[in-house]
UniProtKB/Swiss-Prot annotation:
Probable ion channel inhibitor. Its main location: secreted. Residues 19-51 form a propeptide. Residues 1-18 form the signal peptide. Keywords: Disulfide bond, Ion channel impairing toxin, Knottin, Secreted, Signal, Toxin. The lineage of its organism: Eukaryota, Metazoa, Ecdysozoa, Arthropoda, Chelicerata. This is U31-theraphotoxin-Cg1b. Belongs to the neurotoxin 03 (Tx2) family. 02 subfamily.
Length: 115
């Protein structure tokens, strides 16, 4: 009986220590991978206008150009030509327009224009 308990205890100790070694090995692999990735990464930020300069209906290049919380730089197709302009109205229906303005405001918030 004592031999059985000793064998079971030694197997449990061996399995726990093996798992701990495996966990430490994967943590080291992750650290090495992050270090390798970190050396080759080059982050560049695109310069955007600090203040809005366009009103609704004027030509634009990005959401940061357009003034207003719910005004975005959208596109309109005229024939085969695509024109970008500031716009805020999304629908003729008042309820859908209100929902669209809210969605435009959220999209404009994620444009990260620092004004």
């Amino acid at each position: 009986m004592k031999l059985c308990v000793i064998i079971i205890a030694s197997l449990m100790v061996a399995s726990v220590s093996g798992r701990l070694r495996k966990i430490k090995g994967t943590e080291l692999d992750k650290k090495m991978l992050l270090e390798k990735l970190g050396h080759g990464m080059d982050i560049r930020f695109e310069e955007t206008p600090r203040e809005c300069s366009k009103k609704a209906g004027e030509k634009c290049e990005s959401n940061c150009d357009c003034c207003g919380y719910s005004t975005l730089c959208g596109y309109i197709t005229e024939g085969k030509e695509v024109k970008y302009q500031c716009m805020s109205k999304t629908s003729n229906n008042e309820i859908l327009n209100t929902i669209g303005l809210g969605m435009n405001a959220i999209e404009n918030m994620f444009s990260f224009c620092f004004r």
